[in-house]
Curated annotation (Swiss-Prot):
It catalyses: sn-3-O-(geranylgeranyl)glycerol 1-phosphate + (2E,6E,10E)-geranylgeranyl diphosphate = 2,3-bis-O-(geranylgeranyl)-sn-glycerol 1-phosphate + diphosphate. The lineage of its organism: Archaea, Methanobacteriati, Methanobacteriota, Stenosarchaea group, Methanomicrobia. Prenyltransferase that catalyzes the transfer of the geranylgeranyl moiety of geranylgeranyl diphosphate (GGPP) to the C2 hydroxyl of (S)-3-O-geranylgeranylglyceryl phosphate (GGGP). This reaction is the second ether-bond-formation step in the biosynthesis of archaeal membrane lipids. This is Digeranylgeranylglyceryl phosphate synthase. One of its GO terms (biological process) is glycerophospholipid biosynthetic process. It comes from Methanocorpusculum labreanum (strain ATCC 43576 / DSM 4855 / Z). Keywords: Cell membrane, Lipid biosynthesis, Lipid metabolism, Magnesium, Membrane, Phospholipid biosynthesis, Phospholipid metabolism, Transferase, Transmembrane, Transmembrane helix.
Length: 282
């Protein structure tokens, strides 16, 4: 066991990006208080980190095959220590959420419960687990919006929808990449039932929904936004359509489609941030 293992198991890069996204969402929704952005960053960081810890705890047998280098299967963190660590992080996140407002506190509590149920149960149910992750990713925008006020909820809805559908597509493709390890670990995923090709078709459909939703902010941000998001949308579509060429998880993994899709989603987030900055200063 090691302290470094307890830091690694929260997946700080993943959790940190989620925290930064919450701060950006607050700014896009019209927030102006830097301290609130820091508070949101902390809440999302620790709650997301706790969820990652629980995932590793329940995925121990699968990770022995897929990711033996992770903290629990490698022995850097004990299973019991992981549960305690997750509890501490969840408690810290909920406690910090008490300093926001009733709407944000409600989202934090719902997400904590969902993260626990997801790790223990939903993750093993085909497609339901993917839907849970997609909601949790999109809810970061709702969290940032509600801190500004209930009226900002409507501002965040298109961004929630874009993130929801984009994440859903990526999660399905990730499951398609992990078919062999998931099968050996006893997991049940949608790609195991319908195959890589049909999963890729579903991913393309959900990406198309995300692209359609991405046009809605044009009503607020205008032509410049439309041009920028159009470039990002084209990249995301091309990457996802490329997945249709592959019949096996090995081919899909080698293509790096999920990695490029992640880059495209980051680019979309940058466009949202840029447009809000331009709206404030121009």
């Amino acid at each position: 066991m090691s302290l470094a293992g307890y830091g690694k198991i929260i997946r700080p890069m993943n959790a940190g990006v989620s925290g930064v996204t919450a701060g950006i969402a607050y700014f896009i929704a019209g927030g102006t208080q830097p301290l609130f952005s820091v508070l949101l960053f902390f809440i999302v960081l620790v709650i997301c980190g706790a969820g990652n810890v629980l995932n590793d705890y329940f995925d121990l047998e699968i990770d022995k095959v897929n990711r033996p280098d992770r903290p629990i299967p490698s022995g850097k963190v004990s299973p019991k220590g992981a549960v305690v660590w997750a509890g501490i992080l969840f408690a810290a996140g909920v406690a910090a959420a008490c300093f926001t407002n009733i709407w944000c506190l409600a989202i934090a509590l719902v997400n904590v419960v969902l993260l626990i149920i997801y790790a223990a149960k939903f993750k093993g149910i085909p497609f339901l687990g993917n839907l849970s992750v997609a909601y949790l990713s999109g809810s970061i925008f709702l969290f940032g919006g509600f801190l500004v006020g209930p009226e900002s909820f409507l501002v965040m809805l298109p961004l929630f929808a874009i993130t929801f559908f984009g994440t859903l597509a990526r999660e399905l493709l990730k499951d398609a990449e992990d078919i062999e390890g998931d099968r050996l670990g006893g997991a049940r995923t949608l790609p195991m039932q319908i195959g890589v090709r049909k999963t890729s078709v579903l991913a393309v459909i959900f990406v198309l929904f995300a692209v359609l939703c991405s046009f809605v902010p044009f009503l607020t941000w205008g032509v410049v936004y439309l041009v920028l998001i159009g470039v990002v949308d084209a990249f995301i579509l091309l990457v996802t359509l490329r997945a249709l060429k592959f019949e096996t998880s090995t081919e899909l993994t080698a293509s790096n489609c999920t990695t490029y899709l992640k880059y495209g989603m980051f680019a979309a987030l940058f466009v949202f941030l840029l447009m809000e900055i331009l709206a404030v200063f121009l």
